[in-house]
Amino acid sequence: LTKIKKLYYDGKKKALLISATGTGKTFLSAFAIKESNSRHILFIAHREQILLQAEKSYREILGKIDTGFLSGSEKNISADYVFATINMLAKDDIMRQFSPTHFEYIIIDETHRAGAKSYQKVISYFRPRFMLGMTATPERTDDFDIYKLFDNNIAYEIRLQEAMQENLLCPFHYFGIADIEVAGMIVDDNTHFSNLVSEQRVQHIIEQAGFYGYSGERLRGLVFCRTVDEAAELSHKFNERGFCTIALSGIDTQGSRNDAISRLEQPERQGGLDYIFSVDIFNEGVDIPAVNQIIMLRPTKSPIVFVQQLGRGLRKEKEKDYLVVLDFIGNYSNNFMIPIALFGDNSYNKDNMRRCISDGKNILYGPSTVNFDTIARKRIYEAIDKAHLNDVSLLKKAYEDLKNKLGKIPQINDFSYFGTIDIMRYWDKFGSYHAFLQKYEPNYNVALTGVQEEILQFICKRFARGKRIYEIELLQILLEGKEDIFTVLTAALAQQYHIGLPDTVKESVINNMTNVFTISNEREKYRHCVFIQQTDSKYVISDVFRACLKNKAFKNELIDVLAYARNNYQNNYYDTYAETDLCLYQKYTYEEVCWLLNWPHKINPNAMAGYFYEKNTRTIPVFINYIKADAKRVAYANKFLSDQRITAYSKLNRRIDSPDARHIYNADNENNRLFLFIRKPYEDKNTKEFYFLGDIHAIGRPVPAPRFNGFKIVYELMTPVREDIFDYLLS
């Protein structure tokens, strides 16, 4: 309210309020009007029912006010407070009965609809002193810029997850339930109508709804279906089984909808309703606080729609302690959107998505819970695995949403600051953010040379994820033009991060900064990526890099990349493990393991598979693809015996007396150090990242595995696997 008031008295003409369903947007707008001392008010919505609820709320806050409606049932243009449906107001003969300056204050509810011609017509005509737009979901699928419409003035923003933290909404218990097979076919995006309404499926839905129940004296539920016909037929079949339900669609009158809502809300079941079946007419703008159970029988096509439908039951009500949400999960291609919608994680990072599903109960704030049955969880994992999260259309959409919100081309740090898609998705797809902008942003006029683009992409690929700080800080020192660079680096590391620069690490940094670490087939591709050169007895900035930094645009882009890398390091990689540059439970590629263990050269991934002994550092990273045993490979599947022991197998064609076996079982005597890295093999097949689980040592000697033509060995982990990671790996 304070921010809206400030914008108003600062002379701003428009503002946008982004607030989750159920958090009191309408009440807030009434308080804002009261603060403004405005006399003539216009409240616009797309449905009459929203107007009726808004008018009631305004009377609660403002007392005895002169109100009237412009809708299909009433045409009052003389009231001080006019509540109008957009369809009625947009008619020329109605709108022009008001002068453009008649209303001092205009409220537009569900403002994400304002891209429509009817809204544009009304907004262009009126010239109020102040216009306030209200929505829970400003992002749109038609690329219309809602933020720009309101001059990019965001009065306040509180999304679903923040609203839950602030205890503004009713807690919910979400259950992801596997939809059943009908006639031997899993329900999916193309399931035939007859199977969607089959007796078998209806019985399954009823049984699950009864099992999970509701909070309150009686059941009051909303059921969201994929088609109008499905809603009607399911309602009919529920009624045949003793329920009192109705199906509503866009063809039903406002009076019919109001009557159905009243029957759902009434205290007595006699003459009331247990469920209302619909497709999308209750997605937004309708308050039914009494709803205590929501059933979702359609695929999650959009996180926005998911949150809208979930929000129908999140308004607090004294007769319910919580909302029950039942999501029947079929074999849908868009199942990967469920963790995005539920947890508000817009990073589009597959690992984050999987962790949300496996550890959802520990992620949501407060008493709300999320649970998936085994089959539903498996279907979501499969959808995540198949999802193309570097898809250009997805990246462009996420970019446009953020650009619209800011009213300018976003900088790299804006993506993390505003909690949108991870900037690394752009690096993975295009090599750099600059390359993406150059291709898809018409207002981006920055030009770099081929050498500068090569260097930028190398830094984004190798260092920008912030998995080690040494190279990041050294690049920053080079940018600042400082001399005696390793002396300056040593001081910076001690002062800012309280770490030293051991000789082994320094040598590794030099190898990285002179392109020695890179294997031969990549060396030509990044031949200009030499950042330092040796002059006499010390290292200085290379001639190539010095020349590149003369380009201000290149330098600024690099500053942004390094700022992101530094921030990511501090947030995710600062707490390193036992005299290494690795962090427990973070994920690393083969290349990153070579680099972070200070190996002189990168090793070909094919040679790394399984394990690899590096003689200079005496380190042996053990890489395990954790595959659940099946009938064909049960005898030779890697297997956790506990959270601190795992059975693993050697590479092919190895004997128990082979050198690699000796390096493993005789590690203590040889002063070798073994580390465990583990992944599920379906995870991001292109990157092949492994969770780091710390030091391990062999228990006893290897045992021959003749059918495998190798050996078996049991490892003990020095640190028991953290519970959520352990559960995820075994799930």
What are these regions (language model features)?
Residues 10-33:
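Walker A/P-loop
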Residues 40-50, 194-241:
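Conserved strand-helix element at the start of the C-terminal RecA-like helicase core
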Residues 52, 69-70, 74-77, 94, ...:
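Conserved helicase ATPase core of P-loop NTP-dependent helicases/translocases
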Residues 113-173:
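Post-DEXD/H (motif II) to motif III coupling segment of the RecA-like Helicase ATP-binding lobe
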Residues 154-222:
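Conserved interdomain linker/interface between the two RecA-like ATPase lobes of SF2 helicase motors
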Residues 215-216, 227, 342-474, 481-485, ...:
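Long, largely alpha-helical accessory region at the distal end of helicase-like NTP-driven motors
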Residues 303-308, 312-342:
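Conserved segment of the helicase C-terminal RecA-like domain
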Residues 452, 456-462, 469-475, 582-689:
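Acidic, glycine-rich low-complexity segments with interspersed aromatic residues
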